[in-house]
Amino acid sequence: MLKYNLKISSRFEHIHDGIASILKNDVPPEAEPIYMDRNTVYRLAINNTPIVIKSFQVPNLIDSYMQTVIGKSKSHLSYLNAKRLQKLGFRTPAPVAYGEVLNGNRLLRSYFMTEFIRGGDLRGWENNPDNEPLLRAFAAEMAKMHEAGILHRDFSQHPVYRHAGSRVQLLPHRP
């Protein structure tokens, strides 16, 4: 029998039904894929509220056990990390929700959702004529994180967002 775990931030309770539908029915076809690799990231508007959905890869049996019986799922940890980053004053998209679909103790699917923010990731940063201010902003943000006791473990191009100029935001999936 399937079990659904869903935690929604109070600020986003108005889209509860749409989020619950994702958990029960998977990401809807109208969601726009914006990043596809091991995990898939989608953009979707629910009741005119734009959100980002990270659909985590289905874990193997051992990882599933580790994420449900011994520890927390990646979606749950992402949600907690986002809350922690915000509490410490770091710029990160507001966490909307996390959800898990389980069959007994086996994790079948998990999702982490944040507010949608406009910007771009760091792909192609080396060809950007404004890359020095961007790199300085990135380094300053990392230094602040390290001073706060946070070691960000995912420096691939996707989890670091840049905005016009040199403002940097971190996606909270793996600090």
What residues fall within each predicted segment?
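Juxta-kinase regulatory segment immediately upstream of eukaryotic protein kinase catalytic domains
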Residues: 1-31
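Conserved ATP-binding subdomain of kinase catalytic cores across diverse folds
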Residues: 20-120, 137-143, 147-148
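Active-site flanking residues adjacent to catalytic metal/cofactor-binding acidic residues
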Residues: 53, 153, 173
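Active-site catalytic-loop/activation-segment of kinase and kinase-like phosphoryl-transfer enzymes
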Residues: 115-122, 169-173
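AlphaC helix of the protein kinase catalytic domain
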Residues: 121-130
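Short alpha-helical scaffold element within the canonical Hanks-type protein kinase domain
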Residues: 131-135
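Catalytic-loop of the protein kinase fold
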Residues: 150-157
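Catalytic activation segment of kinase domains across protein kinase-like and atypical kinase folds
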Residues: 158-175
